[in-house]
């Protein structure tokens, strides 16, 4: 180690080796005193912070290195500590991470002739060494900040200041040094020594032309070296052969040609064209081909409206004639409401050098970015089905807009999920179609607070490759790097395709009203395709006539209505598809067997309660396991946790995979599930449901990150790709499900009607009024019922263990795939009355209408109370206390589709009814009252037109529940009293 004081900032390092730390005698006496006090102060801090002892040196050093690269990447307390470190000799600059400097010194040390040698004065050697270090600092500066001077903007409107760190004079290197030879250190171009002029020129070619690479924020040195080794040898400009360059021109011609064709044939019709960003099409083409060469079998794409029609026709091979029919408003022969053409999904198979690949473009709403986690979920399901844990066979590619990528919170959530156990997919290729404007907003100070729209990706240390979309070969190069990086490191990577929007937000919009200067420039711009054609003609790759013929040939194909993707497979391999035909054409009333033989229940019960030898279970959990053993033996009534877990066990035993995610699902928010046991000695875990049977399907249970929106969207995507399994998302409290309201509204309840997409996702939403206040009482049942129509979803409120057992099994065993919204209990999980017997699992099925266990004689009943959920047990307690044999209480366990026939059958048993009441815990404007009363009134009218349905419940309220226990108790008493007296 050099005994020197290093005084540095992020990219500038000055090493003053004149003052050894061991000898401060050269300093003036006052300075020596100040230095001693400073050292004494530092030592006092060190002694007060025991975590800074020598044994932790490597750890602290690594933290400091990380802090220097990205201060936000270290814990707040460490960041605060590092911020307060004193300067040396009053120098105010910040340190630079020494790992990169050490690399440079290693390279220098390998060639001794550039160190001090005999015959050279010592002062000259020291001066040369200082300059050499400054050159290495300059190299490092280009790697860190070269992207800030890259020529990324096709419009030339970016107002970017010069980066002083990239000027050799900043590093005290002058014009006189330009022809001197210096060690190149870890540079990957040229020889070991080069003239400074050539070093700077090479660095500018690599980092400051059409590509701006951000990768130095990545902590992993292997990744940084990987990018340097890819970019520097070719100066970010590989020489592509003429065949590749012609193919690029053909793809650009297709992208531009389709937009021109649609613009002339359907003027003024919205299509959200790709004009200005045509390089996206060759980018996608290369990604698909390169993924195929790595063994990919499936690629799932997600994107918003911009350029979607172009991708459908020119990438996925949709027949142009079908697109023209949509433009002309011809209704296709399908059911449902349909959706606009720029929301439609599509799938096809294309051929690559590595074999056939299935492409699927996800359907999406106008809610930008919400499709991203949907795509990730679909990919994860495909990887699970293919036993592809590394993500080689199934690849996600997601396209974004610059405004939405910077503005939508679900982008952050999706990135945060990317490296977790439950949601990782082995890396995603993100392409930002950065046309520099969001509808009418283009000023950076309005659109974001960050330098780039892509800065959010730095939170997971994703490399970001900015590229000028008017340079197709640069786009090709970053595309190849991106797919290679994903294959090598299994992480996300971002391509920032800096382009422009030639027209308005849509084709009927005039953009000059809000962006006059931008669109004055755009009107004068030559298209990307024509720029590249001119370049190829100038380079002698093609002639002008050949360039024109490529354009004419594409237009002829469109006129004929032929497929324009040459790699499209006309007779695709069906093994690459998921077969949904068994689930088509069935009604929700379709029957299925959900009961299970007693011997099977007992066998599975033993497996569920088996704890490995030496596994130390926490005391309360041990009691739960012991009780479950007794339940299996019939010695105890079964509770909710047993009924639910047994449903999972029986489905696994019958060959159905299961996936459960959500916050705290391993244990369950209310400590009822305990599907994951934790060893109290070493923290190891045991999941009995993973050991139900030999060769059983996969059981996955993951505690999710604290997100509702992205996680529910992920599970929606998963369930639309996994019809044979049970996919469950559970809210920590049902109240929090509305954090994913976009997913519920745009996908879950309307996806089948808009797009024909089947989905069997199950939502478990804890709900119940127990005095816990307005944020921990309501799953907003009324919202799901208000969204219910055309048998789009199921809304169930099970109140017994056997009901949840049959409900979950029915969701998989019935040949129907509809979302299930299950309003689940909290206090009922341990309620002495909310139990079932083993016989209830071995016979019967899910009952949509459920009477009391011991009902009153129908001939005596004059009052019928209809209800759902927990309030039933309050009503039952009151009935028993008052010995009201004239009252019958009936639970409607499925509120949608409403079981009118089953209610009719029950009503037919009661001929002497005088009063019928609907009782609910929720306020009148919430719960089931407004959305379900007409169903109940219709049933009553069929039974006896004179009967009138009355309401017993809380008064209408702006909040779901009150926050005071005393008020809650009074309200609860009143609504129960009303049910019996009104």
Model-derived features with residue positions:
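Thiamine diphosphate
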Residues: 39-44, 53, 83, 90, ...
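Extended, charge-enriched "interface" segments that sit outside catalytic cores
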Residues: 85-280, 296
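Glycine/aspartate-rich loop-and-adjacent alpha/beta segment that forms the canonical ThDP
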Residues: 142-145, 149-182, 186-197, 202, ...
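Active-site cores of enzymes that catalyze phosphoryl transfer or operate on phosphate-rich substrates
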Residues: 236-258, 324-376, 380-387, 688, ...
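Cofactor-binding active-site loop characterized by glycine-rich and histidine/acidic residues
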Residues: 297-461, 465, 670-722
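Hard-cation-handling environments
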Residues: 529, 539, 543-658
């Amino acid at each position: 180690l050099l005994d020197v004081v290093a005084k540095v900032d992020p990219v500038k390092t000055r090493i003053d080796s004149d003052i050894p730390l061991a000898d401060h005698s050269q300093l003036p006496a006052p300075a020596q005193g100040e230095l001693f006090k400073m050292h004494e102060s530092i030592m006092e801090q060190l002694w007060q912070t025991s975590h800074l002892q020598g044994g932790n040196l490597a750890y602290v050093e690594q933290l400091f290195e990380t802090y220097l690269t990205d201060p936000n990447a270290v814990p707040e307390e460490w960041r605060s500590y590092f911020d307060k470190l004193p300067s040396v000799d009053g120098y105010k600059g910040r340190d630079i991470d020494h790992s990169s400097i050490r690399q440079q010194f290693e390279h220098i040390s390998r060639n001794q002739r550039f160190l001090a040698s005999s015959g050279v004065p010592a002062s000259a050697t020291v001066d040369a060494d200082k300059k050499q270090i400054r050159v290495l600092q300059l190299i490092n500066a280009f790697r860190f900040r070269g992207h800030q001077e890259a020529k990324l903007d096709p419009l030339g409107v970016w107002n970017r200041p010069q980066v002083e760190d990239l000027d050799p004079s900043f590093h005290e290197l002058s014009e006189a040094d330009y022809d001197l030879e210096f060690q190149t250190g870890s540079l990957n171009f040229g020889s070991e020594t080069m003239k400074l002029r050539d070093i700077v020129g090479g660095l500018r070619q690599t980092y400051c032309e059409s590509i701006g690479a951000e990768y130095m924020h990545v902590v992993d040195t292997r990744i940084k070296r990987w990018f340097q080794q890819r970019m520097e040898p070719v100066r970010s400009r590989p020489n592509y052969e003429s065949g590749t360059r012609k193919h690029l021109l053909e793809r650009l011609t297709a992208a531009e040609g389709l937009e021109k064709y649609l613009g002339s044939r359907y003027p003024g019709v919205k299509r959200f064209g790709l004009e200005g960003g045509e390089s996206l099409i060759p980018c996608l083409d290369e990604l698909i081909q390169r993924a195929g060469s790595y063994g990919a079998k499936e690629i799932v794409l997600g994107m918003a409206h911009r350029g979607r029609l172009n991708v459908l026709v020119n990438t996925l091979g949709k027949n142009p004639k079908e697109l023209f029919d949509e433009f002309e408003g011809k209704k296709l022969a399908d059911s449902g409401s349909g959706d606009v053409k720029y929301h439609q999904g599509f799938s096809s198979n294309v051929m690559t050098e590595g074999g056939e690949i299935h492409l699927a473009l996800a359907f999406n709403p106008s809610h930008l970015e919400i499709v991203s986690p949907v795509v990730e979920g679909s990919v994860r399901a495909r990887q699970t089905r293919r036993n592809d844990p590394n993500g080689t066979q199934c690849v996600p590619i997601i396209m974004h807009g610059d405004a939405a990528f910077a503005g939508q919170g679900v982008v952050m959530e999706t990135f945060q999920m990317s490296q977790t156990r439950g949601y990782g997919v082995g890396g995603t290729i993100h392409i930002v179609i950065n046309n520099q404007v969001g509808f009418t907003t283009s000023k950076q100070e309005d659109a974001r607070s960050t330098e780039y729209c892509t800065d959010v990706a730095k939170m997971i240390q994703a490399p970001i490759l900015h590229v000028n979309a008017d340079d197709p070969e640069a786009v090709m190069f970053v595309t190849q790097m991106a797919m290679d990086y994903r294959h090598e490191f299994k992480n996300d990577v971002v391509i920032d395709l800096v382009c422009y929007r030639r027209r308005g937000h849509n084709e009927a919009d005039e953009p000059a009203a809000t962006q006059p200067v931008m669109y004055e420039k755009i009107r004068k711009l030559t298209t990307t395709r024509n720029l590249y054609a001119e370049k190829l003609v100038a380079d002698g790759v093609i002639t002008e006539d050949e360039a024109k013929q490529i354009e004419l040939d594409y237009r002829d194909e469109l006129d004929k209505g032929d497929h324009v993707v040459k790699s499209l497979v006309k007779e695709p391999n069906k093994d690459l598809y998921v077969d949904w035909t068994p689930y088509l054409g069935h009604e929700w009333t379709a029957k299925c067997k959900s009961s299970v033989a007693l011997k099977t229940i007992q066998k599975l019960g033993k497996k569920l309660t088996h704890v490995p030898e030496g596994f130390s279970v926490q005391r309360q959990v041990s009691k739960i396991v012991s009780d479950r053993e007794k339940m299996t033996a019939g010695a105890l009534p079964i509770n909710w946790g047993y009924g639910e877990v047994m449903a999972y066990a029986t489905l696994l035993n019958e060959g159905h995979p299961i996936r459960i995610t959500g916050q705290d699902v391993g244990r369950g928010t209310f400590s009822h599930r305990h599907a994951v046991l934790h060893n109290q000695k070493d923290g190891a875990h045991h999941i009995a449901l993973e050991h139900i049977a030999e060769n059983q399907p996969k059981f996955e249970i993951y505690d999710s990150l604290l997100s509702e929106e992205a996680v529910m969207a992920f599970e929606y995507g998963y369930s639309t790709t996994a019809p044979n399994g049970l996919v469950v998302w559970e809210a920590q409290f049902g109240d929090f499900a509305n954090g994913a309201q976009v997913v519920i509204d745009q996908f879950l309840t309307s996806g089948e009607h808009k797009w024909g997409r089947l989905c069997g996702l199950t939502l478990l939403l804890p709900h119940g009024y127990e005095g816990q206040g307005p944020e921990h009482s309501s799953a907003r049942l009324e919202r799901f019922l208000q969204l219910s129509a055309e048998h789009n979803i199921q809304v169930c409120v099970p109140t017994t263990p056997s009901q949840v057992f049959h409900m979950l099994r029915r969701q998989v065993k019935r040949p129907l795939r509809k979302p299930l919204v299950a309003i689940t209990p909290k206090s009922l999980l341990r309620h002495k009355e909310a139990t079932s017997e083993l016989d209830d699992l071995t016979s019967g099925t899910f009952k949509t209408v459920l009477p009391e266990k011991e009902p009153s004689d129908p001939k005596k009943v004059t009052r019928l109370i209809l209800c759902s959920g927990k309030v039933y047990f309050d009503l039952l307690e009151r009935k028993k206390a008052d010995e009201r044999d004239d009252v019958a209480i009936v639970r409607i366990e499925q509120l949608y589709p409403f079981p009118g026939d089953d209610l009719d059958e029950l009503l037919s048993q009661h001929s002497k009814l005088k009063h019928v009441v609907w009782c609910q815990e929720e306020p009148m404007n919430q719960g089931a009252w407004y959305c379900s009363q007409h169903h109940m009134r219709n049933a009553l009218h069929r039974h006896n037109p004179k009967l009138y349905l009355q309401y017993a419940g809380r008064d209408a309220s702006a909040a779901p529940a009150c926050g005071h226990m005393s008020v809650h108790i009074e309200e609860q008493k009143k609504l129960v009293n009303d049910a019996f007296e009104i």
